[in-house]
Amino acid sequence: MNIQNDKERLLNGSIDEIEIITTDNNENDTIRNDDILKNSQLREQQQHQQIQQQIQQQKKESSLSTIASVIAFYFFISISLVFLNKILLSDFKFEYPLFITWYQQIISFVSIYIMTSISKSVPALSFLPEFEFKSATASKVLPVTAVLTGMVIFNNLCLEYVEVSFYQVARSLTICFSLILTYIVLKSKTSYRATMACLVVFLGFVLGSAGEVNFSWLGIIFGLLSSFFVALYSIAVKRVLPAVDGNEWRLSIYNTAISIGLIFPLILVSGEANTILDEPLLYSGTFWFYMTVAGLMGYLISISVFMQIKHTSPLTNTISGTVKACVQTILAVVFWGNPISTQNAVGILLVIGGSFWYSMQRFFEMKK
């Protein structure tokens, strides 16, 4: 019996030891499995983070590429438009600025119609509204279109009589007129710093004009009128936007269509229609190519500004405009050989610097 009991105790002890060993092994296996799982999860997290970092880097590179592209597009369109119009008016010696403006408005109108027609099928143009033209809306928009028409006409007239290097100075008093009209029409006062910036621009205008080698009173007068209409348009457009549901692109449809009708009678009254048919350039394919491209540029400038603000910011748009003015002046000196006196150069720098200061000041005031 004792021997039998001893055997049973030994057997039970062995079983217990086996169970303990098995339990320990199971626990060790569980720990190892947990470690393997944790390491696997850690590797997955690291891989996920690496993938996310790569995606962010690609987005950043893509974003920088997009920003650089839209700014370059704005520079190209804006400077090309000025140069093309100068070529038409001076190099071709086509002395019919009203006809040039009228034809370019027609090209812009055709461009608008095409772009709005395909906007639904082209995601990049989804911001454009459907084409429409209602007489009731047109009558409300008419006063603003008249201002815009004056602005475009005097722009081209100014460019006909001044050098491209002086063009920025001749039209520089826009912010000064804006300050005056804002006070008279909107009863709104401008801050001290913004006013000082306007004075810097005015001083630059005076110095630049006095130092201009190829000075033209007509160019100065047309530049002043252009500046006045630009300032007036920026105020008047705010009052008419409700008529087009606050959509500036819809307003551009009406502006372009109505301006075509407004400019045509001016061509007749000015006398351009009496002699234009005798102009040999009307039978030149090169001339019409330049005219058409300039018309396309006139519409694309609005698109380029919109894209620049969309992908950057209003502040970047302001800085870009200032740099563009510098580049435009330099290119005018290089390609056209426009002579610049020291006084004229100081005036140009004051105008560009003052305009930049004013824009920056207004931007930060609006953010408050």
From Swiss-Prot:
Predominant cellular place of this UniProt entry's protein: Golgi
UniProt-annotated location(s): Golgi apparatus membrane
Presence of the UniProt keyword Transport in the record: yes
Membrane-spanning intervals of the chain: 64-84, 98-118, 141-161, 166-186, 195-215, 217-237, 251-271, 287-307, 332-352
Catalytic activity annotation: GMP(out) + GDP-beta-L-fucose(in) = GMP(in) + GDP-beta-L-fucose(out)
Membrane topology: Multi-pass membrane protein
Single GO MF annotation: GDP-fucose transmembrane transporter activity
Key words of the record: Golgi apparatus, Membrane, Sugar transport, Transmembrane, Transmembrane helix, Transport
Entry GO CC: Golgi apparatus; Golgi membrane
GO biological process, one term: GDP-fucose import into Golgi lumen
Cystine pairs: none
InterPro entries tied to this protein: Sugar_P_trans_dom, TPT_transporter
Family named by the database record: Belongs to the TPT transporter family. SLC35C subfamily.
Stated role: Antiporter specific for GDP-l-fucose and depending on the concomitant reverse transport of GMP. Involved in GDP-fucose import from the cytoplasm into the Golgi lumen.
Record PANTHER family: SOLUTE CARRIER FAMILY 35
Name of the protein this chain belongs to: GDP-fucose transporter 1
Species, as recorded: Dictyostelium discoideum (Social amoeba)
